[in-house]
Structures are given as C-alpha cells and as structure tokens.
UniProtKB/Swiss-Prot annotation:
Keyword field contains Lyase: yes
Modified how: Contains an active site 4-methylidene-imidazol-5-one (MIO), which is formed autocatalytically by cyclization and dehydration of residues Ala-Ser-Gly.
Residue ranges crossing the lipid bilayer per the database entry: none
Catalyzed reactions: L-histidine = trans-urocanate + NH4(+)
CDD domains xrefs: PAL-HAL
Species name: Staphylococcus aureus (strain MSSA476)
GO biological process entries: L-histidine catabolic process to glutamate and formamide; L-histidine catabolic process to glutamate and formate
PANTHER family in the record: HISTIDINE AMMONIA-LYASE
First-listed, main subcellular location of the protein, grouped into a coarse class: cytoplasm
Protein name: Histidine ammonia-lyase
Residues bearing PTM 2,3-didehydroalanine (Ser): S143
Compartments reported by the entry: Cytoplasm
Family: Belongs to the PAL/histidase family.
Length: 504
C-alpha cells in the first residue's frame, strides 16, 4: 500500500493501515507546488534583507537580534543542536515514525518555507524506516515539542542516533551506507522542523489506536466474565439504550448482545437474581462513555495532523505576501484531548478490576471456588492477580491527573504559558499499558472461571476466544508464576492491534 500525503486529508486510519502494511509514502504534486511557493517567499525575504523572526533574527528572547546574512544557515544548525535536550527513554519506533509523517504532512501545507530537499529527506527516512531515536522527556508543549523534534532533525542532518534494521547506529553511518547525503539546512528550515506539536500528536495517535482497540477487546473479556457469573442479559436490550440516545452506549450494548448470543450460561431477570451489580449491568454505559472520549480525541488529533503549526507562518493572498508570528505551535487543544483520553482508558481498567474481583471473591462469585484456587488453602490461585490489578488501577488514578492544568514560564518569561501536552501524552500511554495488563488479568481469570463453569455453555463467539487464548494461557491446575501468563496475554493483545486481522 502507498500512503499519499497532501497536507490536508491524513487520517488516523491511514496511519494505522500504514503501520499494519509497512507502506511507503508518496507526495501529491499539488503539495509539492505549495512547498515551492512558500520557499520562494523565504528566498525573497533573504534577498530583500527583511526582518522576519527565525529567518533573519534569533529565537525566543533573541527575536530582536538581527543575524548576519552569511550566518542564516548556521543559525538553523545551531538551533537544532542547542535544542536537542531531550532526556530519558526514547519514544517507541512507531511513535518516532508517525512523528516524521506528521511533520512532513505539516510542511506540505505550504506555510513553513521548507525546501524540497527537506521534504524529500523526511520522505526518504520514512520509506527506508530510518527511525530517529527521540528521548521522551524535555518538552513543555509550547513552542511545540522543541526538544523531541530537534532530535528528529539531528538524524536528518546526520548527527543523531537512529534505529535501522533493528540496530542502533549513527545517522551519518546509515546515510553513507545508503549513499545518501545528510540534509544541509537552509534558512528557516531548522525552525520549520521543530516548531510544532508532532511529538505529543504522534504519541496521541498511537495511544488512540491502542485505546480504541482496548475498548473492543474489553468487551469480549467482559462477556467471558458475564457468563462465568451467570449475568443477566436483559440490561443489554436495545430499547434500554435507545431511550438514552448516546450512540456509543447503544453500540456497546449491541456488541455485547452479539458476543453473548447463544450462551446457555447467561440468565434473565429474576431467574437467579433480579439485577446484576453495576460492573456487569452498566457495561454499555461505562464502556460507551469511554468510546465517547475516544471519538473526541480522534477528532482533535485529526485536526492537528492536518494543521500548520509552525511559526512564523507564510501566506500569499492576491499576490501579497504575509509572514506572521502566531501561536499555532501551542499544544493546548491536544493536551486537553490527551488528558481526556487518560480518563477514558482509566475507567476501562477500573471496571475491569471490579469485574475480576467478583470472579475471585467467594462472597460474590456464586459457586466458583475462592480465588478460583484448584485446592483452596494449599494453593492461592488468583488471589494476588487481583492485588496486581488493584495496584495498576490505583497507579492510573495518579497518572490521570491532568497535565494540562500545569504551566511553567520559560525563555525568560517570553514563553510564559505552556501546555504540558507531551507530558499528558506520555502519562496517557503509561495508563494504556497498565490498563492492558489489567484486562489481561481479567482475561486469565475469566478463562479459568469459564472452564470451571463449563465452556460448552459459552456463546459460540466467546468460545472461539476461549480456545484462542487457551493456546497462550493453560488451565490453572496448580499455583505457578502467573506474571508470565499476564504478560503473555498483554503482549498478544498489543500485537493484534497492528495486524490486519483485528481482535474485534
């Protein structure tokens, strides 16, 4: 598959397909023409010796310092080197790859003044899967993601570290191996590479993809739990949800009915009890609300994926040129969205932990043994799996605190309000990893509970899931190192996201 970039129409589904199918990038001709026109404006500014921020002046507090024309290119290289102050563990290779795609798409809007050489260098790195190693920490989220994007830019000019064919190498060595020249930054180009929100947005895109999939995966896991507890299906009737109007809730209820169709383990109202606890009865309402969050986040991300968030921005209208210093680099809209994402995913984990507690608690699990132990007393069974889930959801409650309510001044108070959007993105992904493990714990426990109940009573769809995951996690016949089972399921759930055959 080829992904065609035009600066205007990139979607998250495009990105997901690109990652699944190991695609290549192509650029449409109209976008290249826009790049040429905006670059011509920069060249005119240089020729006319105009005073324009970041082209003929310094940066930040030094915006009033005029640069000697012979040093315009040096200014851009100095910018990249000095701003590459990222720290900590690197972003995943998927996030770094998406970061390059998003920055390229922004340049194609034709408001940044980049050269075709810069555009082609980004395209080359993407298509050859030369992945810059980009530290996660160091961004305030305004002026955009300066530190992470500077590490991206270092790789393009042959000075950074990259991951290539599974090995960490110097960018310069990889470029020599591929007979490719490092990029020679021209006036404005360093700024055009780093003034933007691509780090937080790229992590946000990956987080959205994985969150949405977790939402779908949580439904069949919940369906296993529901059957193991002889849950009541009446609460999932369409008319119950239609009168509330939330489409996401209606959709979850429909999918739950589909997962449970044909089960002989489910019950009706008053057969065993009149109504279930909320963690079973309210799955459509709780999970549906998370999908509402996901839909909002998707909308915000796709706006930003196709936005010009450089500074200054170049405009041409009726043969008149405008170069305007604005603030589109400010990450506040994405920071808010990614803080919301943390809430949506945290609740999937919270309700999962409460469901699995019902499976192991002898006061709540009906006729199942305490902690599903094969020999209660001598063997502890799933006792500490619930502890682990409780620990993860409690950690998520701390991580879910909104990063976007924080701000700190920088650049001698010139940049006196920042978004902390990349912090929101990073914490959000930690929540996703924790939530995936909580759902893996519920899966391991629900598989065992279903076995004890009798898998022949499962619905056909959940029986297939049971068989699929029993190939990863064998029956619990004695105590063992359950952390291995949990991690194996969590990894399987994660890997399935980027396969063309999804779990849902």
């Amino acid at each position: 598959m080829t992904l065609y970039l035009d600066g205007e129409t990139l979607t998250i589904e495009d990105i997901k397909s690109f990652l699944q199918q190991q695609s290549k990038i192509e650029i449409i001709d109209d976008a290249l023409e826009r790049v040429k026109k905006s670059r011509a404006v920069v060249e005119r500014i240089i020729e006319n010796e105009e005073t324009v921020y970041g082209i003929t002046t310094g940066f930040g507090l030094f915006s009033d310092v005029r640069i000697d024309p012979t040093q315009y290119n040096e200014l851009q290289v100095n910018l990249i080197r000095s701003h590459a102050c990222g720290l900590g563990e690197p972003f995943s290779k998927e996030v770094a790859l998406v970061m390059m795609i998003l920055r390229l798409n922004t340049l194609l809007k034709g408001h940044s003044g980049a050269t075709l050489e810069l555009v082609r260098q980004l395209q080359f790195f993407i298509n050859e899967r030369i992945i810059p190693i980009i530290p996660q920490q160091g961004s305030l989220g305004a002026s955009g993601d300066l530190a992470p994007l500077s590490h991206l830019a270092l790789a393009l000019i042959g000075e950074g570290k990259v991951l290539y064919r599974g090995e960490e190498k110097d960018s310069d060595d990889v470029l020599r191996e591929l007979n490719r020249q490092p990029l020679n930054l021209q006036a404005k180009e360093g700024l055009a590479l780093i003034n933007g929100t691509q780090a937080m947005t790229a992590q946000g895109v990956i987080s959205y993809i994985e969150s949405e999939d977790l939402g779908y995966q949580s439904e069949w896991i919940a369906a296993l739990t529901h059957q193991s507890l002889n849950g009541i299906i009446d609460a999932y009737r369409h008319d119950v949800h239609a009168v509330r109007n939330f489409q996401e809730q209606i959709n979850v209820a429909a999918r739950m009915r589909d997962w449970l169709e044909g089960s002989t383990l489910t019950t009706r109202q008053a057969e065993i009890r009149v109504q279930d606890a909320y963690t079973l009865r309210c799955i459509p309402q709780i999970h549906g609300a998370s999908f509402q969050v996901f839909n909002y986040v998707k909308q915000q991300l796709e706006f930003e994926m196709n936005a010009a968030n450089d500074n200054p921005l170049i405009f041409e209208e009726a043969n008149e040129t405008f170069v305007i210093s604005g603030g589109n680099f400010h990450g506040q809209p994405i920071a808010f969205a990614l803080d919301h994402l943390k809430l949506g995913v945290s609740e999937l984990a919270n309700v999962s932990e409460r469901r699995l507690e019902r499976l192991v608690n002898p006061q709540l699990n009906g006729d199942l043994p305490a902690f599903l132990s094969p020999e209660p007393g001598l063997q502890s069974g799933a006792m500490i799996m619930q502890y682990a889930a409780a620990s993860l959801v409690s950690e998520n409650k701390t991580l879910a605190h909104p990063a976007s309510v924080d701000s700190i001044t920088s650049s001698a108070n010139q940049e006196d309000h920042v978004s902390m959007g990349t912090t929101a993105a990073r914490h959000g992904y930690q929540i996703i990893e924790n939530a995936r493990r909580v759902l893996a714990i519920e899966c391991v426990i629900a598989l065992q509970a279903a076995e004890l109940k009798g898998v022949e009573g499962l619905s056909p769809k959940t029986r297939r899931k049971y068989e699929e995951f029993r190939s990863i996690v064998p029956s619990i016949t004695h105590d063992r190192q359950f952390h291995k089972d949990i991690e194996a399921v969590a990894q399987y759930l994660k890997q399935s996201i980027y396969q063309t055959t999804a779990c849902h």
